[in-house]
Amino acid sequence: MMSKLGVLLTICLLLFPLTVLPMDGDQPADLPALRTQDIATDQSPWFDPVKRCCSRYCWKCIPCCPY
């Protein structure tokens, strides 16, 4: 019984760090990659030129201002 519990504990400890680490698909896109997609944020009505970020509707305008 103890050996089965030890095997189960070892498997859980080996799998846990793999699920905690962010995968490549979870990483946010960097700004140079966004600039190559021809996104005109300066012409967006939600772009704040003083803060150099978008104040609202960040799914339409990039980069988003922190709240």
UniProtKB/Swiss-Prot annotation:
Give the signal peptide range: 1-22
Any idea which residues bear 4-hydroxyproline here?
P63
Q: Which UniProt keywords apply?
A: Cleavage on pair of basic residues, Disulfide bond, Hydroxylation, Neurotoxin, Secreted, Signal, Toxin
GO MF term list: ion channel inhibitor activity; toxin activity
Q: Which tissues express it?
A: Expressed by the venom duct.
Which ranges of residues are annotated as propeptide in this record? Answer: 23-50
Q: Which residues form a coiled coil?
A: none
What's in the domain note?
The cysteine framework is III (CC-C-C-CC). Classified in the M-2 branch, since 2 residues stand between the fourth and the fifth cysteine residues.
Per the record, the similarity remark reads:
Belongs to the conotoxin M superfamily.
Q: What name is this protein filed under?
A: Conotoxin TsMMSK-011
